[in-house]
From Swiss-Prot:
It catalyses: RNA(n) + a ribonucleoside 5'-triphosphate = RNA(n+1) + diphosphate. Gene3D superfamilies: 1.10.132.30, 1.10.150.390, 1.10.1790.20, 1.10.40.90, 2.40.40.20, 2.40.50.100, RNA polymerase II, clamp domain (4.10.860.120), RNA polymerase Rpb1, domain 3 (1.10.274.100). Its cofactor is Mg(2+); Zn(2+). The keyword Signal does not apply. Keywords: DNA-directed RNA polymerase, Magnesium, Metal-binding, Nucleotidyltransferase, Transcription, Transferase, Zinc. The RNAP catalytic core consists of 2 alpha, 1 beta, 1 beta' and 1 omega subunit. When a sigma factor is associated with the core the holoenzyme is formed, which can initiate transcription. Belongs to the RNA polymerase beta' chain family. Pfam families: RNA_pol_Rpb1_1, RNA_pol_Rpb1_2, RNA_pol_Rpb1_3, RNA_pol_Rpb1_4, RNA_pol_Rpb1_5. GO terms for cellular component: DNA-directed RNA polymerase complex. This is DNA-directed RNA polymerase subunit beta'. Mg(2+) binds at D449, D451, D453. It comes from Caldanaerobacter subterraneus subsp. tengcongensis (strain DSM 15242 / JCM 11007 / NBRC 100824 / MB4).
Length: 1183
């Protein structure tokens, strides 16, 4: 029995004609499909039941045998085997071709494999195959050469001249003969010799030919199998024909394509039998070749075959390629049972780990569970009556549903699922209505809001799946973001506003300065209405210190007392050992969004996830309650326009008039005038904003919303009540006419018109960049999907040195941020020689702070970049799992997490321009395209010139151009670089530079850096550049995610000289495999190969993976499969994608084999077993 778990690998290769006949159940001889009167398949046609099996279960074509009892009988009348109709999905047929036909993938692919083997150009090959020219097969004793092309006229001339002394042919037959004659071993030796001797184009061509020849030798494929004598016909249920309502038929395009092949083949047979003239036969053969081409890959050569309405027909290749192809549509994106979707509404009364499930949906989803429980409880006699009860929705069904649903988690997912927090598990609570209720705190993780978003529900069925959902996916366990380890469940909007209002204080309100003997008394006074929630009061606090009660009077407000009741009082914000501060409230200042984040971070670090979930719920209750009580809302009167605005605008007008006057007098250029005007207006806008902020009361609702981080920003307040300021035109150039009004006053027509440019551009950009970002994520996932934590420690001594990342004087990422949660690669010692962190220990927050204080600027840490694990990475090189704060577990799919961590904010960034309404500001265009350029390792736009040698800079300027010469006096070498017009220099005359330093401003080409400075420099450069883009957008991503992607980009070695190994020059080979091969060679006393590390872009790297299934499902499906088939590749099923494609459990997390092989044994059984074992051992010892 074929079981999915039973196989380790999957192999692809070329099929020989014998193999195709072996697969087949019979030959398809007629182009007929089904009889339109009886609607039964025609015999020997494309749907023939004799070949492919019966259309109805257990029933032959003529109806002589019906029922299961005749299973396996072959009907003597119609020849159909009595069996299940399902076999029509697996039984294949074949067509015996009257003339051989070339397989288009191997002719037209790039590079043309057939062309390389025969050493013919693709054009020459095409001429022969499509009957334009003759090719000499055997020159005999004539002056012709083998494989020489002859036109019709030349052929006739030579025929008259030499008669039968030479042989030439055309079409696939001739090519087949040439392919059969190839001696691969001999050719391989010749090519290897040629590679050693030749140079330039000739050598490159020889290397490419050798690659193909070697592939055929290693895989055991024969070259002539690229020519088809027999064409396989795929099972009929994979190319179905169905009857539509009006009696017409809809059929798969493949049937049309097969029909054309069969018609032409039959006609060719007839012509050959009749002995028709050569020219007619040749034309028919060419048509047959074209028909087979169209079937395999329509449109690859010439015009595609079209169906009704000029639509190109979908060929076998099209069935596989692209988003709608077999790989991405059906193998990686299956639809699943036990799922539903509905609109979401907010459920503030839920706990963090709960969600509201509509009753009718729950009943349908849990139907089998409910039916079983009904039978178990004796409410129904058997499953059939239980099913009827559920379908009629009897009242007793609801009680049973409640029981079934209890403790059975469900998964909620919102598309687009940009990171793993887009699917989480919740405990369902039945609700009336037809909407799913979602807890407000999980919205940020899903990026969900309640303006009509929909979510999907999935039910984990098996016990294992339920356990995983409960322990790994429950929302209460996913409080931290995997990308940076910060809490993702931070309160937002109303909750923030409520807490802000609650912890504010105000002067001159009732009850100010009163004393209370305890917090409880203060609360009572507030509830009875004697004091205001914001009044500054004195309260006597009592605490137990070292077993004795002590008390002290502190100043606070009732609001702060209420807020502190919701959070633990040991978070370390207050020094509890100092008697001065020991009695203070943990949080005694104004709480805004960032402060809430810090509080939750501490709660998680100190008390763990369960307590954090409780605290979150308490903060949520408080927030909603007090934002309601405060009744904060926006009204037009809250938008206070500052009095100074008029004066500031007048000053600006005068300033602009002065600038214009200077320009007219010719004192400044047009460019300077423009810059100055823009600068003036920007300053004015700033001043107006400052005046506005000073005017607003601190209890002004709009100010509170922005200041607390609940909603809106300073920028938006400026537009409401200050002035909108400068706008950009469609090209992105800033229009020098500012918008003086704000939305409170209203814009005039011209101002409104100017502002539409920015708004429209914002929307268009958003739409485009969302797509770009999604595509970037897809490539990142594909390149890193097989990186899984596979071992404890790879044992390497290597590591990378990290220091803070700076851009000019600005620190982009602090050193402590970069080393927290990483493993030290060597002892970290302060100046006095005290060890702060030992080698192979994790650096935590406190230690990182110590390192900072000790003034250490460079630290060596373990990194995925230097990890020696063959597949994936080890725990030590990866360090802390950011989502849990512990050392990463074996089996964690860190590659996919890395891709999501980088891709998810990509989309966030892309969606950012949209909210400001298009006010001129920093656009992310340097953002996303820059990240893409780095990961694809492209030559960047605005290239910086870098020096290849170290030395002193000499700058020479002649009339037309500037040159920089770098002189290395020690080794007496110098190099001169031409500086393009308009570049800004980064160096001064006489300055000393290192090899690899930039001479001009701009981005460095990573490939040049790799050549000059080596691997470490490139890795560090890519990492820092990617970080700069994200940090400038205010997005934090941990280094290790970017390191994993860079590791995947640099996994391969490009072989330069193969030595005596079997590798080919110019071949890309896995670094570890390269080292292995060399080790083997050295052991045998042979010459090892030399090579250099290659830097591949993520697309290239994803296509260069060992798994052909993963590569084929990514991009360029036909090219990948062609290549894999010739090489006879074996896919070892190591990554995640390949296993999903063939339907095995993925080898990550609980699917890792080390976890799958665990069996659960009862304790008593185990003890018994051990006793028996012990007795056996004792008996053996005594004997």
């Amino acid at each position: 029995m074929f079981k999915l778990k039973n196989f380790e690998a999957i192999k692809i290769g070329l099929a020989s004609p014998e193999k195709i006949r072996e697969w087949s159940r019979g030959e398809v001889k007629k182009p007929e499909t089904i009889n339109y009167r009886t609607l039964k398949p025609e015999r020997d046609g494309l749907f023939c039941e004799r070949i492919f099996g019966p259309t109805k279960d257990w029933e032959c074509h003529c109806g002589k045998y019906k029922r299961v009892k005749y299973k396996g009988v072959v009907c003597d009348r119609c020849g159909v085997e009595v069996t299940r109709s399902k076999v029509r999905r697996e039984r294949m047929g074949h067509i015996e071709l009257a003339a051989p036909v070339a397989h288009i993938w191997y002719v037209k692919g790039i590079p043309s494999r057939m062309g390389l083997l025969l050493d013919m150009s693709p054009r020459a090959l095409e001429k022969v195959l499509y009957f334009v020219s003759y090719v000499v097969i055997d020159p005999g004793d004539t002056p012709l050469t083998k494989k020489q092309l002859l036109s019709e006229k030349e052929y006739r001339e030579y025929l008259e001249k030499y008669g039968n002394r030479f042989r030439a042919g055309m079409g696939a037959e001739a090519i087949k003969e040439l392919l059969q004659e190839i001696d691969l071993e001999k050719l391989s030796k010749e090519l290897r010799a040629e590679i050693k001797e030749s140079t330039g184009q000739k050598r490159v061509r020889a290397i490419r030919r050798l690659e193909v020849v070697q592939a055929f030798i290693d895989s055991g494929n024969r070259p002539e199998w690229m020519i088809l004598e027999v064409l396989p016909v795929i099972p009929p249920d994979l190319r179905p024909m169905v009857q539509l309502d009006g009696g017409r038929f809809a059929t798969s395009d493949l049937n049309d394509l097969y029909r054309r092949v069969i018609n032409r083949n039959n006609r060719l047979k007839k012509l050959l039998d009749l002995g028709a003239p050569d020219i007619i036969v040749r034309n028919e053969k060419r048509m047959l070749q074209e028909a087979v081409d169209a079937l395999i890959d329509n449109g690859r050569r010439g015009r595609p075959v079209t169906g009704p309405g000029n639509r190109p027909l979908k060929s076998l290749s099209d069935m596989l390629k692209g988003k709608q192809g077999r790989f991405r549509q059906n193998l990686l994106g299956k639809r699943v049972d036990y799922s539903g979707r509905s609109v979401i509404v907010v459920g503030p009364e839920l706990k963090v780990y709960q969600c509201g499930l509509p009753k009718e949906m729950a009943l349908e989803l849990f139907k089998p569970f409910v039916m079983k429980r009904l039978v178990d409880k004796g409410l129904a006699q058997h499953i059939k009556s239980a099913k009827r009860m559920v379908e009629r929705v009897r009242p007793e069904v609801w009680d049973v549903l409640e029981e079934v649903i209890k403790e059975h988690p469900v998964l909620l997912n919102r598309a687009p699922t940009l990171h793993r927090l887009g699917i989480q598990a919740f405990e369902p609570v039945l609700v009336e209505g037809r909407a799913i209720k979602l807890h407000p705190l999980v919205c940020p993780a899903y990026n969900a809001d309640f303006d009509g978003d929909q979510m999907a529900v999935h039910i984990p069925l098996s016990m294992e799946a339920q356990a995983e959902a409960r322990f790994l996916m429950l929302a209460a366990n996913n409080i931290l973001k995997p990308q940076d380890g910060k809490p993702v469940m931070t309160p937002t909007q109303d909750m923030v506003l409520g807490c802000y209002y609650l912890t504010a204080d105000e002067d001159g309100v009732p009850g100010e300065g009163k004393y209370f003997s305890s917090p409880e008394e203060a609360l009572m006074a507030y509830q009875l209405g004697y004091i205001h929630i914001h009044a500054k009061i004195k309260v006597k606090m009592t605490r137990e210190i070292n077993g004795e009660k002590k008390s002290k009077v502190i100043e606070t407000t009732v609001g702060k007392i209420i807020f502190n009741e919701a959070i633990p009082q040991d978070l370390g914000f207050v020094d509890r050992n100092n008697p001065e501060t020991a009695f203070n409230l943990e949080i005694n200042d104004l709480v805004d969004k960032s402060k809430l984040g810090k509080i939750l971070d501490r709660v998680y670090r100190i008390h763990g996830p369960t307590k954090t979930a409780e605290t979150l719920d308490k903060i949520k209750e408080l927030g909603f309650k007090y934002s309601t009580k405060a009744a904060i809302t926006i009204s037009v009167s809250d938008m206070v326009i500052p009095k100074e605005k008029e004066k500031l605008l007048k000053e600006a007008d005068e300033m602009v008039a002065k600038i214009e006057a200077q320009f007219r007098r010719g004192l400044i250029s047009e460019e300077e005038r423009y810059e100055k005007v823009i600068e003036t207006w920007n300053m004015t806008t700033e001043k107006v904003t400052e005046a506005l902020m000073a005017t607003l009361d601190k209890f002004n609702p709009i100010f509170m919303m922005a200041h607390s981080g609940a909603r809106g920003s300073k920028n938006q307040i400026r537009q409401l009540a200050g002035m909108r300021g400068l706008m950009a035109d469609p090209s992105g150039r800033i229009i020098e006419l500012p918008i003086r009004s704000n939305f409170r006053e209203g814009l005039n027509v011209l101002e409104f018109f100017i502002s539409t440019h920015g708004a429209r551009k914002g929307l268009a950009d958003t739409a485009l960049r969302t797509a770009d970002s999604g595509y970037l994520t897809r490539r990142l996932v594909d390149v890193s999907q097989d990186v899984i934590v596979r071992e404890e420690d790879c044992g390497t001594d290597e590591g990378i040195y990290v220091e803070e990342i700076r851009e000019g004087n600005e620190i982009i990422e602090k050193l402590s941020d970069r080393i927290i949660g990483r493993i030290a690669a060597e002892d970290i010692v302060d100046s006095e020689g005290n060890v702060i962190v030992r080698r192979n220990e994790m650096i935590n927050e406190e230690e990182a702070e110590k390192i900072d204080k000790a003034g250490i600027t460079r630290v060596k840490i373990r990194s995925p970049l230097t990890c020696r694990s063959r597949h994936g990475v080890c725990r030590m090189c990866y360090g802390r799992d950011l989502a849990t704060g512990e050392l990463v577990n074996i089996g964690e799919a860190v590659g996919i997490i890395a891709a999501q961590a980088i891709g998810e904010p990509g989309t966030q960034l892309t969606m950012r321009t949209f909210h400001t309404g298009g006010v001129a500001g920093v656009d992310i265009t340097q953002g996303l395209p820059r990240v893409e350029e780095l990961f694809e390792a492209r030559k960047p736009k605005g290239l910086a010139v870098i020096t290849e040698i170290s030395g002193v800079v000499r700058i020479n300027e002649s009339k037309k151009r500037r040159e920089i010469t770098v002189v290395d006096e020690e080794n007496n070498i110098s190099k001169t670089y031409l500086i393009p017009y308009g570049s800004r220099l980064k160096v001064r005359d006489g300055q000393w530079v290192q090899a690899g330093d930039e001479l001009t401003e701009g981005s460095v080409n990573p490939h040049d850096l790799l050549k000059i400075k080596g691997i470490y420099a490139v890795q560090s450069y890519l990492l820092q550049e990617v970080q700069k883009v994200y940090r400038l957008q205010g997005v934090e991503i941990n280094d290790k995610h970017i390191e994993i992607i860079i590791r995947q980009m640099m996994k391969k070695v490009k072989v330069e000289d193969p030595g005596d190994t079997s590798m080919l020059p110019g071949e890309l080979i896995d670094m570890f495999k390269f080292e292995e091969e060399n080790k083997k060679a050295i052991e045998k006393g042979l010459r090892p190969a030399t090579g250099r590390r290659a830097l591949l872009g993520i697309t290239k790297a994803a296509l260069a993976t060992d798994s052909f299934l993963s590569a084929a499902s990514f991009q360029e499906t036909t090219r990948v499969l062609t290549d894999a088939a010739i090489k006879g590749k074996v896919d070892p099923l190591i990554g995640l994608k390949e296993n999903v494609i063939i339907g095995k459990l993925i080898p990550a997390g609980t699917g890792l084999s080390r976890y799958r092989n665990i069996t659960v044994v009862k304790k008593e059984d185990q003890e018994k077993k051990e006793e028996v074992k012990k007795e056996a051992v004792d008996a053996k010892a005594s004997s």
